[in-house]
Amino acid sequence: MNSSGKVLILGASGGIGGEVARRLVADNWQVRALKRGARMRDPEDGIQWIAGDALDGGQVAAAAAGCDVIVHAVNPPGYRHWRQQVLPMLRNTLQAAERQRALVVLPGTVYNYGQDAFPLIAEEAAQQPVTRKGAIRVAMELALEDYVQRGGRALIVRAGDFFGPRAGNNWFSQGLVKPGQLPRIISYPGAIGVGHQWAWLPDVAATIAALLARRRELEPFARFHMQGHWDPDGSEMSQAIQRVVARYGGRAVVKSFPWWLVKLAAPFNATLREMVEMHYLWRLPVRLRNDKLVDFLGAEPHTPLDSAVYQTLQGLGCLPAGAINQEAGEA
């Protein structure tokens, strides 16, 4: 069977990068992944793991040799060192892409936008960030635009808050539930009655894969927004968790996330300071329009919420092994 193409993924050990890698392997791409440290993964996963650092331009360029696409899904861990590392890593990606004439894929965020763009955001909405992290994301997209003006090609797929069975660095797994145990408390960060947008990572990966399958039809600087799972009043995600937990004989209570405690500790911790900066995204409804995506693909890849939540909780070790799913009657 012929390959769909060759792709280098930066950040393949993370949530979105890992899901995209697995999806592209399934779609018969030749997938390379750059990762600090050697022999980090099973070679039977279909991915060619290459030891290297996204901050080393030479290593990125060597890993990208012969690639049609580079997926830039790498970030500094947590909220740390964004100012020092994010743009240098992207510069290395763009320099490597320019040598290979490769399409660069960037998973986008809503951090780019301020309240002037809320509540319903289309691809052409003005980007006027109100946080330091948002300003860096805008700078990243401007760098991509500059790359396109020099003859390159870029694709941005923007989605809501990520969650998924293999993702640990997100609000679902670090806020709503605690990995490794059946949820008893759901710690919800949002305001009551305020809508919030979620994106299941396998659906995001499927969307990126579908767009890459038609990459020759894309405009040079292609931007698409996903709808994902829109929670109109902030209760549907918590209720979905409760339903899955109940199927395993548990009971989960929804409580408010302790923002007061985060704000109290924020002066002493950089990660917590950044979390407080992003609090506005939980106080206001922020929704991405997916009209353009649907027009292009015909439909957005979409897994029903309860199924997505079930698979996520299972992947996070929140559902006890060997327990009986009381609704399905199976382990």
Language model segments and positions:
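N-terminal Rossmann NAD(P)H-binding glycine-rich loop of SDR-like oxidoreductase domains
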Residues: 7-27
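NAD(P)H-binding glycine-rich loop region in Rossmannoid oxidoreductase-like domains
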Residues: 37-100
